[in-house]
Amino acid sequence: MADFNSPIQYLKEDSRDRTSIGSLEYDENSDTIIPSFAAGLEDFEPIPSPTTSTSLYSQLTHNMEKIAEEEDINFLHDTREFTSLVPDKADNKPEDDEESGAKPKKKKHLFPKLSSHKSK
């Protein structure tokens, strides 16, 4: 069970952006601990949840779909730039030449200048 004799402390800012330490006050008649700065907020109406507000939900859904479409367009644009790097025809030759009976071919180096300098 919680110890209500020691107050819970938090940082708060005033109108001049000065930070001070506030404490939560316990009301024995209430089910919750209310911070001292929250007095008078009983009539505060929170933003409705998307399940209860269909207009807000549809607005958010529309915005998310629009963002997703824009990202898809950007993605397609980016991939078109690199299509020249992909060969037109796939090389379907078997990788293991020993199974096909052919002599293994000497593989070309990716960096011929580096391969020409052999260590002594």
Swiss-Prot record:
Name of the protein in its database record: Protein p14.5
Source organism phylogeny: Viruses, Varidnaviria, Bamfordvirae, Nucleocytoviricota, Pokkesviricetes
Keywords attached to this entry: Acetylation, DNA-binding, Host-virus interaction, Inhibition of host innate immune response by virus, Inhibition of host IRF3 by virus, Inhibition of host RLR pathway by virus, Late protein, Viral immunoevasion, Viral release from host cell, Virion
Chain intervals with Basic residues compositional bias: 103-120
Main subcellular localisation: virion
Expression induction or repression: Expressed in the late phase of the viral replicative cycle.
Cellular component GO terms, alphabetical: virion component
An example molecular function term from Gene Ontology annotations: DNA binding
Source organism of this protein record: African swine fever virus (strain Badajoz 1971 Vero-adapted)
